[in-house]
Amino acid sequence: MFRRVFVPACLAALMMVLVSPPATAGVIWEEGSFDEVMARAKKADKPVMIDFYAVWCGPCKLLEKKTYADAQVTAFSNKFVNTKVDVEKGEGVELAKRFRIMNYPTVLFLRPDGSEIDRLIGFLEPPEFLQLMKDYYNGVNTLDDYEARMNEDPGNIELVFTVGRKYVDRADRESAMPILDKVMAMDPDNEKGYAEQALMQMADAERKAGDISAAIAFGEKFVESYPESENTKGVLYDIAYYHKKAGDNEAALGVYKDLITKYPDDVNALNSFAWFCAKSGMALDLATDIAQNACKLSNDDPGILDTLAEVYFARDMYDDAIETIKKAMAKDPEDDYLKEQLSKFEEAKKLAES
């Protein structure tokens, strides 16, 4: 995609002589199926960068708007064949299963033969993203690289932990757990802070393997062992999510209530509570108050407004839902997800009035 520059007619003659190249407006994404993209990569002998995303995912949108728009990221991305995969549509559903994509966004880096180099999970600022792109392109700080270094220096707890974490990132519990057990043994009193990190990774490994009961047990052990840790909030999020995934919404609601009690001014905690209530149909009166407060604290962030709109929608308050989502759209008018939300609310109102 290129930015077009318009100039006065009197400069047209000069422009015929002196023309500067157009500036790229972001990463160029290849169209086509996965097999077609891989065939192009193999022919060009280039690695592949695949952005696995969901349309509703806030960090995915931020990665697109901020990181992929960065000039240096854009320039270096030309060393890859780049493509985007919607994990909820078409072959994206199967590709997400094939590569064990369980967090969004996940940016997967593959060799031309289709084998994995490494992956990035979540939003990263442009400088960090760029550095890791360069590292992975050069085979540095990948799982293979860290594992080789760990084998040369097995007493280095940072290397051991990083290898374990990278296996968790790939949803490889069998490889991850023995390594994370070793981390726990190397830092039994958590003096270096690695024991609690390992416990968090163990919970995530079990979650990705589908053993939700084990994930909950590891999470609860963390909260009991490290109640004042800066990571406790995130672990409470995880425990609530695990209960929800297991179908125990009552237990999930209890954890979410603990979360907003412990962190009453945390926008993400409030938003998570309200979103859960909207989707589960539980505690909707309280969720309305909580979501309204989250909107105030976030200065009406579009994503938080969307949550409030969903709470109204769950209460059949369609006019309020429509008004709120329009407020979100005014702040982010190009967001397709918000447009879909408006259509959903308007259709529901029509059905209710028919």
Regions found by a protein language model. Give the residues of each.
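Local sequence-structure signature of Cys/Sec-based thiol-disulfide redox active-site neighborhoods
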Residues: 27-69
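Alpha-helical adaptor scaffolds
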Residues: 199-208, 220, 233-245, 250, ...
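Register position in tetratricopeptide repeats
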Residues: 135, 139, 169, 208, ...
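Thiol-based oxidoreductase modules, predominantly thioredoxin-like and allied folds used
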Residues: 27-32, 52, 67-92, 101-104, ...
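Short solvent-exposed coil/turn linkers within tandem alpha-helical repeat scaffolds
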Residues: 71, 119-123, 153, 170, ...
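Non-catalytic, surface beta->alpha helical segment in thiol-disulfide oxidoreductase systems
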Residues: 68, 102-141
